[in-house]
């Protein structure tokens, strides 16, 4: 438990920061789900457009420290591979 004023302030800031980070993480997951939904429907154009929208947002979350660089790259790579497989079929 926070005892001195500076640690109490840090605890308050952590609560705010955690809530903000959770909302950003949720937003990114929603964009990823939109891409996955387009892939499930078999819409190549819709999936590529959704990925084009989602990729810069995923990258910006890396800069903010919400996701690691490797997780973002892995996610984008897997989505792109699914889209390429969709086009091939």
Curated annotation (Swiss-Prot):
Please provide, alphabetically and separated by semicolons, the GO molecular function terms listed in this UniProt record: small ribosomal subunit rRNA binding; structural constituent of ribosome
Where does it sit, as one GO cellular component term?
small ribosomal subunit
Q: Which InterPro entries match?
A: Ribosomal_bS20, Ribosomal_bS20_sf
Keyword terms: Ribonucleoprotein, Ribosomal protein, RNA-binding, rRNA-binding
Q: Which residues form a coiled coil?
A: none
Q: Name one Pfam family in it.
A: Ribosomal_S20p
Q: What does the entry give for GO biological process?
A: translation
What PANTHER family has UniProt attached to this entry?
30S RIBOSOMAL PROTEIN S20, SMALL RIBOSOMAL SUBUNIT PROTEIN BS20C
Task: State the family named in the UniProt similarity comment for this chain.
Answer: Belongs to the bacterial ribosomal protein bS20 family.
The record's function comment reads:
Binds directly to 16S ribosomal RNA.
Q: What is this protein called?
A: Small ribosomal subunit protein bS20
- Tell me what organism the protein belongs to: Hahella chejuensis (strain KCTC 2396)
């Amino acid at each position: 438990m926070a005892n001195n004023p500076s640690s109490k302030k840090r605890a308050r800031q952590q609560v705010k920061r955690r809530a903000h980070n959770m909302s950003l993480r949720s937003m990114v997951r929603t964009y990823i789900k939109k891409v996955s939904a387009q892939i499930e429907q078999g819409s190549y154009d819709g999936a590529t457009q959704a990925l084009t929208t989602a990729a810069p947002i995923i990258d910006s979350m890396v800069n903010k420290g919400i996701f690691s660089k490797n997780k973002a790259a892995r996610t984008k790579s897997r989505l792109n591979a699914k889209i390429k497989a969709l086009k091939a079929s």
